[in-house]
Amino acid sequence: MTLLSLQGVACLRGGRLLFEGLDLVLGPGGAAVVKGPNGAGKSSLIRVAAGLLRAAAGTVDRSEAALADEHLALDERQPLGRALAFWATDPAPGIAAMGLEALADVPVRMLSTGQRKRAALARVIASGVPLWLLDEPGNGLDADGLARLEAAIAAHRNAGGAVLAATHQPLALPGALDLSLT
């Protein structure tokens, strides 16, 4: 069973070719980490995989996916627990995984940068979908937040999920494929 398949994928942004001929297949338990300098196309690759950006060439096939990027995608007026409940029938697993229990009744707009990042990741965790697409998931996280993220990813993979992550920061994903964009 394939959760994500990219075959011969190319991406153009602003008339500039970011990458081409990219092949990647992720099955249950799979992971890939995309690395490269600013502007190399890491975020664009995540957006192509999510179906938010059309590939200039190649094919993209994916299962149901959840995306965490720079957009929080939570109603800032709502308490965190209620905002997460919009995306998941039971947001509790995501809240617990990211250590946000004490903030469940706090309006999203009151969260710090790190807490907002944890909330975005809690949304993905609680989604219950097999494929996680993570764009710079460690940005804004402290050491505890990063450890919680890595533990959540490990649990997701052990349960048969897959992860594609683009990052500048070290992210412990044992056995993950390394994709370097230049």
Predicted regions, residues:
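Catalytic Walker B motif of ABC-type/P-loop ATPase nucleotide-binding domains
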Residues: 132-136
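Hydrophobic anchor residue at the start of the ABC signature
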Residues: 121, 160
